[in-house]
Each structure stands twice: as C-alpha cells, then as structure tokens.
Amino acid sequence: MAMGTCAVTASAADGDKYTIGICQLVQHEALDAATQGFKDEVTKELGEDAVTFDEQNAQGDSNTCSTIINSFVSNNVDLILANATTALQACAAATTDIPILGTSVTDYATALEISDWSGTTGRNISGTSDLAPLDQQEDMLVELYPDAKHVAILYCSAEANSKYQATEFEKYLDEDGISYKEFTASDSNDIGSVVQSATEYADVIYIPTDNTMAQNTEAINNIALPAGTPIIAGEEGICKGCGVATLSISYYDIGKKAGEMAYDILVNGADITTMKIETAPNVTKEYN
C-alpha cells in the first residue's frame, strides 16, 4: 500500500499491507536495538503478513543514506524509519510527503535546524529522542570521581547531536567548578591520537551518545585503559565497550515507541505534523 500524504485512514484488519523503509546509519549495538524494537512493535501491532520492511544500512556514509532514502521515495513506501541523525536529515531533504519517524536522534531542533522549537516539527517528521538526563550523568561522574579536576569530553565533530550534548554537559560541570576540554575526532581515523591527548589532560573522560565513538570503543579502550583514565559513557553500548559507568536509556524502548507511533499514523490516521517527539520512559544505571 503506497501513500502520498502524511496521514492514512486505514485499518490493518481490513487486509491492508504496508511497506516501511528503514535507513540505519551504521551498525552498532544501540542503533541495532532501536531498529529491532521498532520492527517488533510494528509486527506485533500489524501482524507479520501486513508489513514488509525494506531495511538498509548506510555503513556510516551520508551519501549512502541519501541514496537509500531516494530509493524509498521512488518506491513510494508508506513510512520511513530514520535511525540516527544523518539518516533523518537525508529523509528531510528527500520528501515532504511520506511520513518520517526518527529514532536514536538526540535533538530534533538541532538536526532539522528549527529555531522556534515547540516539541513538534510541523511537517512530515516526528519520532523518538535518545537524549539521556545529562545532569544526572554529570552527577554520576562527580559521585564516582569526587576528586576529578579535569574532564575530557570526547566526541565526533561531524555529529551535531554530540556537540549539543557536550555543550549541555559543560553547563553542569561549570556549576560544580570542574575544568573541562573538548577533544573531537573528525572521523574514525583521528580517534587514536585524540583519545591519547584526552588521557593526558583528564582525570575522567565523558563520551556522549555518538555513533563514531560507538563504532570504535575497542580502539578507545586500548588507549584509555592502560592510561588509567576512566570513562563515563552516554549510553550502554559505549559503556560496555570502553566505559566504567553510564546512566542510559534503552534504545530498544525508543525504537518500540517509534513503532507505536508508526501504527498510530498508518492505521489510526494520526497527523504526524502535530505528533510530539517522544523520549525514553526510563533510564538505568549500568556499570562495567
């Protein structure tokens, strides 16, 4: 079943069949969990026979994201799931008609360059955010390392959502009088030298939710662990790979929530232009 508007008035019980395109930026634990949560929920709500998923992975390349999304648009899929910010931005540029749900996107206003933010995009885009409580993550850092004087904030400069988290996290460090410095890698090739510099500066490293860092936790751990520099992570996948602790959302849960939103759009005819961005219902402390 194809569609050219933002809302559908149909019922899966009437035998309608839907095609959903899924563009995942890259393969790593967090994004994989979000995609799985989405598929599980949509399949549960619609039934296996009522939905076909065209699932594509862009292998971390923005141009590949655009190619994938353009193929979805050409095939006139009923809805697109954009898993990660780069995928969402490619969708936003490709279509104003097909409903787009984002997931694993931290800040939609930043990603879509919306200056007057009210919780909805006002266009054919909604979804779920992976923004964790940054104030509580900073509290965790202080609780675990009360003598820390210098914090390195490590992220990829190409990821706008990571910069947003870093800026917000720094506000809480300022409140506690803790010095900090940003250490940014432009891509995976820079990570080794950047992490080495971070360990030389910091008592503790903080890594926000960041796809490039999530892909390279082994390389990060191989430098930070021998240096004796602990890492507080923004999400559980990074924590498992190189961190000491995190206060993390469940990526499976935000994918599942996006699946609920998809059902509401496809079957109940919900107007995506007025659907608020949803957040994770719970956060969990995890230690490694």
PLM region spans:
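An alpha-beta-alpha
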Residues: 20-22, 38, 126-173, 271, ...
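Flexible loop/turn connectors
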Residues: 237-287
